[in-house]
Regions:
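Conserved NTP-donor binding/palm subdomain of two-metal-ion nucleotidyltransferases/polymerases, i.e.
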Residues: 1-115, 121-380
Length: 380
């Protein structure tokens, strides 16, 4: 890894150890643009020495920060409003993902970009919650048909009529179609035992909400991230988990025991091992601890998955004719799966030719079109 890329890694480390002292930047214009594209632009004005940057780039970074501050504050205030209304009818929601971890562990909460706000409530509370959403000015909106949400882990998303803030009201952590769905750790009974009262507003403990326990948060974030390859926003899973491990006391025996289920172990291992091997953690987590996770990944699996993480998440490499965004996603899902290693190597070229999730994979016209794209076009 060259000096340019090592410097980029150091910037990521500064976030997860909450070091906001500016550093002399050797980042290229393109590298900074990639960080912005990856949704990390809001923190760069704090971390980079702007004396070496062009006025245009400084203006862009200032704009990223101001936009992130405004957008986060809007989401945050509307979350407080919803929690207040739910508390009035004796419902205490559980905060999930970005809204939970940003308000507790990020050096500045607006660093954590969020497309929507995720909360979890009991199944029998859904109807009451949806009445409150309508009262507060939200309406449900989705391009997917209603039957899709009958087995989904959250109801039809809610969008505010004027402020464009989205909420997802979860009844479970994963849909029935997910490999993570049957895991014991994600069952409602376990969540209810694990969750902890932790007010989102430390200055106003009259607002009551839960957060997942730290061990469950680590496994949930890793599993949600690992099920499919996400380039844009995918880095937040690494930052989220590194902040948990660097700033809280995690019960490793509990984490390892809970993670030792099919698929869950693979997702958790590959992310935690990447953090450890690249010195994202402050020493509280060791390779020996991570290696106790009973995953099914071979050396080749781990090598390929780590290359995908490094090249497409951290360095922002462009996709190519063969390794298109769709094909990288196919390879990711294959090599992180629980299939035997030799089968993965056999299936890899087959899946590239015949995409497993495509209804047209055996359609001749579709295949001819794909082959032309692979041979003659470059895809970002």
């Amino acid at each position: 890894m060259n000096a340019q890329n090592r410097q980029l890694y150091r910037l990521f480390r500064k976030i997860v150890v909450k070091d906001l002292n500016k550093t002399t930047t050797v980042l290229s214009h393109d590298t900074i643009l990639w960080a912005i594209h990856a949704r990390l632009g809001s923190c760069l004005i704090d971390l980079l020495d702007t004396t070496e940057l062009s006025s245009e780039l400084i203006s862009l970074l200032n704009s990223e920060e101001l936009t992130a501050k405004f957008w986060f504050q809007t989401q945050y205030q509307m979350t407080l409003e919803l929690i207040s209304e739910l508390n009035k009818i004796n419902i205490t929601p559980t905060l999930l993902k970005g809204i939970s971890i940003s308000t507790e562990l990020y050096p500045k909460a607006y660093y954590r970009a969020m497309c929507d706000v995720d909360i979890l409530v009991e199944e029998h509370e859904i109807e009451q919650v949806e009445k409150i959403m309508g009262k507060l000015g939200y309406e449900q909106s989705s391009l997917l048909p209603l039957p899709f949400y009958e087995t989904h882990h959250h109801t039809i998303p809610w969008q505010h009529k004027t402020k464009d803030v989205w909420f997802e009201i979860h009844r479970k952590l994963f849909p029935q179609s997910s490999p993570s769905y049957p895991a014991n750790i994600f069952q409602i009974e376990n969540i209810n035992r694990d969750k902890q009262l932790s007010p989102i507003d430390s200055k106003n403990d009259s607002l009551q909400n839960y957060r997942l326990g730290y061990e469950l948060q680590v496994i949930y974030i890793a599993s949600h991230w690992g099920e499919s390859f996400k380039q844009i926003g995918g880095l937040f899973a690494f930052i989220d988990i590194a902040l948990i491990l660097n700033n809280t006391t995690v019960k490793w025996d509990k984490l390892i025991k809970s993670a030792n289920e099919p698929y869950i172990a693979n997702y958790t291992y590959i992310l935690l091992s990447y953090l450890v091997n690249n010195d994202f953690l402050n020493g509280s987590t060791t390779k020996q601890q991570v290696n106790k996770i009973k995953h099914s990944l071979s050396f080749i699996d781990t090598f390929i998955l780590n290359k995908i993480i490094t090249n497409y998440l951290f360095l922002g490499d462009s996709y190519g004719r063969i390794l298109t965004i769709d094909n990288v996603s196919i390879l990711w899902e294959l090599f992180i799966s629980t299939k035997p290693a030799f089968k993965k190597l056999i299936l890899a070229p087959i899946y590239i030719i015949f995409p497993p999730h495509s209804a047209q994979k055996f359609n001749l016209d579709f295949q001819v079109s794909r082959i032309k794209n692979l041979l003659f076009k470059s895809s970002r």
